[in-house]
Amino acid sequence: MHRFFYFLTFFFSITLLSHPNSSIEKYPDEMAHAPTPLPDRVVLTWNDDPATTQAVTWRTDTSIEVGLAQLAIANANGRALKPDEFKAETSYFESDINEAHYHSVTFKNLQPNTLYAYRVGDGVNWTEYYHFKTASSSEDPFSFIYFGDAQNEVRTHWSRVFREAFRDAPRAAFTLHAGDLIDEHNMDSQWGEWHQGPDWVNGTIPVIATPGNHEYQKDSETKRIWTNKDGQPINIEIESLNNDNPEIFIVDIEDFQNRTGTIKIKDSGEIIDADEGIELITGYKREELINKPILGGKAPLYDRLQNPDGIQKVSNHWRPQFSFPIQNVPDERLKETLYYLDYQGVRFISLDSNIEMEIQVDWLRKVLEENDNRWTIITFHHPLYSPASDRDNFEMRKLWKPLLDEFKVDLVLSGHDHTYSRTGLIDEKKVENIPTGYQQAYDPEIGTVHVVSVSGPKMYEITKGSYAKKLGENTQLYQIIDISKDNLRFRAYTATGKLYDEFLLKKRKDQPNLLIETGP
């Protein structure tokens, strides 16, 4: 008995000594990601011609009512800069944990292939000067970096992938993100982590992004809004619902700061019990909630759906923090998610694979018909060919693939499946256990290469990948794509910078692209 007691004492002593910071609590998200008068979340995007325009957005707290940007052609002596000043468009933004102002400026009438210096602020408090370079007006060679889903543990595990990619391609023209940049569409802390990963790089290398399913708000009975004691809305999610007793509902709750609680509600809607977790989440004491309704004018919590109309909507963060082209799209919800940009002989097209896929077909046909660029690259989140066991985007493939084939699109960049797969010429005798249509994933008479990739730590299992030339599981990746007049070189690297896959596409007159395997 004494020996067992001494063992326990020794074990707990060692445990306490091993964790000297065990009493330290997590720094609150609302403080870690709070806006200040100083600009943060500075991002370059394009909403027009990359050779003559450049858009920049940034965030401050609401005390900054007027945002300003200064711009000059860069020179070797910073003190000799004579910048022009531009007033930003400023909009109020309320997230789940804070209020902010977003500011946006589009610099216009710029000179092609020119290095500019700019900074943003309020006239007193300025950022450092950033550089950006406008696109050339000709088909000069360039490189860009492509990322699949970042999504989870973005600050912890995705940041290193982005930074390794930047080490390999510091002169990249832009970064391209194929959706699911974050996990919870409207969680400000997750968007804050996404900005922290690239940090200042987003302010000097522009961003192209297409939305994933996690950027979209969907109708869900589990995602709800309450009002806390201070009158502020709080987002919560119902983790479980136990109604073994038909007159009493036991509801387990988790908010977006990962705080949990349990509440008991009568079938009539009256609260009959609440634990300490509910007190922490709502700010109400238990006795303030007991016998109060959860619905109606006197309800302290006022439970309601986050998305009562059931219409899928892109994240509230998407449009204030990015400024993508607003083009003649067939549905208002597709603004800045369905768009195209031309960059030095390449047409880049973002399709929105989350909503209204059918009505995008006519828009896409027109964009492809009017395309006089030498190369065409399309990005959308959900892949036409999925290596994951429970996924097959048949309807999307039926709608979009005929157009990709007709116009011989060169490259399709996707995410969603948390794996790596890349199509190419394969031995058809080895193709098995795949859905109908996967046999034509790569057709040398068409030449389109489809890539699925993942940059974050969340991973899925490959169960039907025999259609692909190259596959990968449990590997965080980034891709560097080099484009010149007649060649497209594609390289995929692991998070540690090791070459994982490589191929070359060669343009041929009046023939499909020639695909040359050059990788390990």
Locations of regions flagged by a protein language model:
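Acidic, histidine-bearing metal-coordination/catalytic regions of metal-dependent phosphoesterases
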Residues: 6-10, 14-146, 167-168, 225-228, ...
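Extended active-site neighborhood of metal-dependent phosphoesterases/phosphodiesterases
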Residues: 104-107, 115-132, 192-232, 290, ...
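PAS-family sensory domains
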Residues: 105, 272-273
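Active-site neighborhood of phospho(di)ester-bond hydrolases with catalytic His/Asp-centered motifs
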Residues: 146-148, 174-180, 207-213, 351-352, ...
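Conserved hydrophobic beta-strand signature of PAS-family and PAS-like sensory domains
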Residues: 269-272, 278
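PAS/PAS-like sensory domain cap-loop motif
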Residues: 278-289
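Sensory helix hotspots in PAS and closely related PAS-like folds
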Residues: 279-280, 295-299
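Active-site-proximal segments of metal-dependent phosphoesterases and phosphodiesterases across multiple
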Residues: 355, 371-412, 430-434
